[in-house]
Amino acid sequence: MGSVLGLCSMASWIPCLCGSAPCLLCRCCPSGNNSTVTRLIYALFLLVGVCVACVMLIPGMEEQLNKIPGFCENEKGVVPCNILVGYKAVYRLCFGLAMFYLLLSLLMIKVKSSSDPRAAVHNGFWFFKFAAAIAIIIGAFFIPEGTFTTVWFYVGMAGAFCFILIQLVLLIDFAHSWNESWVEKMEEGNSRCWYAALLSATALNYLLSLVAIVLFFVYYTHPASCSENKAFISVNMLLCVGASVMSILPKIQESQPRSGLLQSSVITVYTMYLTWSAMTNEPETNCNPSLLSIIGYNTTSTVPKEGQSVQWWHAQGIIGLILFLLCVFYSSIRTSNNSQVNKLTLTSDESTLIEDGGARSDGSLEDGDDVHRAVDNERDGVTYSYSFFHFMLFLASLYIMMTLTNWYRYEPSREMKSQWTAVWVKISSSWIGIVLYVWTLVAPLVLTNRDFD
């Protein structure tokens, strides 16, 4: 009897795994909107890929695989274990993930509502999609080496640059939303408490930035030949000061009363992170001390020599992973009623936007049904661009690939080396980020015929 009930329970998941029905949720979870649940599932799948890539970079993993009798090729096995671990494995895994999301992005172009047959592929058929993704990843491991790694390094660098820009847009949106929320609460009541919270958060961000600048000058500008680092730190510091001053100018405050120093402080902290991340990729090791060497635990170079494995757990890599996770999940759960996010996701037709808030009661969720389903809230129009969402995850896959391999390039001498290209990609992205933020401040003054509310 128990087995029959178990089979019936499993059968209830078949529409989720193999059909276009809204995905079933676990009983402990509240019913949610299909638009949010779908994005979270895709983001979680990408997170699983990140975890697998991290496992592939664990030191000694190849040695452990070699211990499996008959598994590795060098023991007359069938699997070349040297390509299952290390940076090459990360490149191939991320190549498979990137191709999976790119194919979905191309397939979902111009989907306007969930009534489009292609929307069924986006919101359902999970078993087949993930099976296809795994097949693509496995196939990537059979790609001949040739110039694959070199070409994919440059593709990954370009994609990671684009994803950093998306991170910046999401960060600007988050900063504006954060400030707007706290200002509203301050105006509604208990103004002293919320004003203190707003002031404390702003001061903390600027304090962290100031401490970072001091540490940068102390540890990343010596010897005297580290002129590039001095220029990077000085220029970005001046740009952040200029953006902060601009955010509180009377003209800016008049056109955008809720712009302020909180948003500027968030952008300043992120700019300092990008500056630090860029300096850690400098080929000149004297200007690029590791965090462990700074705090006195290690005096070795951050660039691995011949025979050494890539250490993906460098501090800047860990922070990059954390920011990646926050941005991906923020973009997945962000409600669609924010105009800046709508512009980012290319959902320009405001009349088709549906609020991502409460569940619809149009029969999608039957009363008294104790099975929790994701409610289809996109019958009248999508809440986000399916195509752009997948394209963003495509770029995220490339960003993860570059982050886990520390933006190193594999040389014919079998060494992993930092490249000035990676330095300039990160520094230029920090400058573009400040320009984007300044544009959000001055746009209402320049484009007076447009509504920026």
From Swiss-Prot:
Keywords, alphabetical: Endoplasmic reticulum, Glycoprotein, Lipid biosynthesis, Lipid metabolism, Lipoprotein, Membrane, Myristate, Phospholipid biosynthesis, Phospholipid metabolism, Phosphoprotein, Transmembrane, Transmembrane helix
Cytoplasmic side: 2-39, 110-123, 173-197, 253-259, 331-387, 448-453
Lumenal side: 61-88, 145-151, 219-231, 281-309, 409-426
Residue positions the entry lists as glycosylated: N298
Family annotation (InterPro entries): TDE1/TMS
One term under GO cellular component: endoplasmic reticulum membrane
Highest rank taxon of the organism: Eukaryota
Lipid positions (N-myristoyl glycine): G2
Main location: endoplasmic reticulum
Localization per record: Endoplasmic reticulum membrane
Function: Enhances the incorporation of serine into phosphatidylserine and sphingolipids.
Family: Belongs to the TDE1 family.
Subunit structure: Interacts with SPTLC1.
UniProt-recorded name of the protein: Serine incorporator 1
Lineage of origin: Eukaryota, Metazoa, Chordata, Craniata, Vertebrata
Primary gene name: SERINC1
